């Protein structure tokens, strides 16, 4: 978001807490103030060379002045809140057509199905008019900080991402497959990607007891992008085992007592589909569409196992007789995901990872 300092001598960035929402902010070199992308508060930094010495006083110091316009963001202690990020990378060779639609559909689902307040949902897309809600690396980082800021028992948090994902060689030995999974912000070519280790440290490990986090990640190589300790390996018959993905180093990748569950678009070595076949009507990511469809069709109290099975079956049957007996919705889905072709299905399998193992056919799914 900020240009690098002109000096060739590297100086570590200074971190300050926002005077409004207390989110950690990275202060550009030489700056004396910074505006928070989340609550819009302006935090001023005194120049130590010119600031007068503090006067002794027995009176308590006044609270910092907050310059945030009211009603911009929810208070971070809401019972439910979500960060939804959809990136189309438009006008670039990486362009995706369906990701902003994914974000809008997920927002609609959270509000209408799971009773999230519209004010508790932070949207990051290229269509946002506020430049601080464009899905740059810095804005995404601050949004993730906001998501878990001050969370308490009873809170339900959601992180949805639709965009490019990648992976890179891991050298510290904490990955079973030898690769770190990554998310690609809008400016990833200049600012770099967000690595799974950082995502885990930001929104997983701080979760206290009683807080529930769900991530829905529609991206390539996203199977273990939250770096959670356990992966549910399920076959076509619906039988499953939990694979232990805890690092051999012993580094803890779980929570501080809370619950973290991730549903992702594909395995770490697979890619996720995005299509513009019906762009005059709609375009979306395969995983997000199947996730929402499975939720809408499910009965009250559906389990994680039945949800995952439904998503996998829909994707697997895409292109094979229009998805079976699903009717108009499935036929449209088939055209959408195969570009109008009736030949072959998609080669991606949604994955489930968690901080703890559980019976996926007994635990009800809810956000």
From Swiss-Prot:
Catalytic residues (UniProt) = 164, 220
Asked whether the keyword Nuclease is assigned, the reply is no
The keyword Chaperone belongs to this UniProt entry's keyword annotation: no
Q: Where are the transmembrane segments?
A: none
Start and end residues of each stretch annotated as Disordered: 47-77
Q: What keywords are annotated for this sequence in UniProt? A: Autocatalytic cleavage, Hydrolase, Plant defense, Protease, Thiol protease
Here the segments flagged for biased composition (Pro residues) are: 50-73
> A Gene Ontology MF term for this entry?
cysteine-type endopeptidase activity
- Look at the named UniProt entry and state the broad enzyme category this protein falls under: hydrolase
Q: Which GO terms describe its biological process?
A: defense response; positive regulation of programmed cell death; proteolysis
Question: Under which EC number(s) is this enzyme classified?
Answer: 3.4.22.-
Question: What is the documented function of this protein?
Answer: Cysteine protease that cleaves specifically after arginine or lysine residues. Does not cleave caspase-specific substrates. Acts as a positive regulator of cell death. Required for both oxidative stress cell death response and hypersensitive cell death response mediated by immune response.
How this chain assembles, per its entry, is: Interacts (via N-terminus) with LSD1.
Tell me the protein's name: Metacaspase-1
Per the UniProt record, the source organism is: Arabidopsis thaliana (Mouse-ear cress)
Lineage of source species = Eukaryota, Viridiplantae, Streptophyta, Embryophyta, Tracheophyta
The gene coding this protein: AMC1
